[in-house]
Amino acid sequence: MVTLATIFQQYGPAYREQGGNTLLPSHLRVMWCIEHCRTAALGGHRYQCDTCGEVVYSYHSCRNRHCNQCQLDKAEEWLAQQEAMLLPVPYFLVTFTLPQEMRTVAYANQQVVYNLLFRCAAEARQALAADPRFVGGQGGAIGVLHTWKRDLGYHPHVHFLVPGGGLDFVNERWLPARNHFFVRVEPLSKLFRARCAMG
């Protein structure tokens, strides 16, 4: 079975050589952890049967949050926690992508730019949700940062799972989104780009 670890083990050296000093230390660390998860490189325990003498090795896990081999249970637990918070309303997937012009700066300043991406996306989404032409209330969201496309090209974007409506705190009521969509993409895109440009 092909796993991320086997891909990294097979193609990682060439990738690291090609990337040279443009690869971030954090990415190199993740690759190293995944490549060596549950291998002798991380140490382990040796168990031996008292009856037949059979020896079995149990190697340590890397415990890196990006490792799908040893952290799958935690990922599934997180997903179950998020599902438990869902309201009995329709939901929308809203995606915000960092403008192409900002990606070189983003790659060199990831923490600052990713925080900016989340903040600008959340503010734009909330501003339009509060607009009575769309929802007219305060909405919620669960956001997840993705930094790569399927072909592993650098492509920072945030996915928000957004309930189809919002709370009107003045009248203490739920306001459902209209016309089977959350907000219109054109004004949302413009507002998001303007907020990104302002920083």
Predicted regions and their residues:
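Beta->alpha loop/short-helix hinge microenvironment recognizer with preference
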Residues: M1-G199
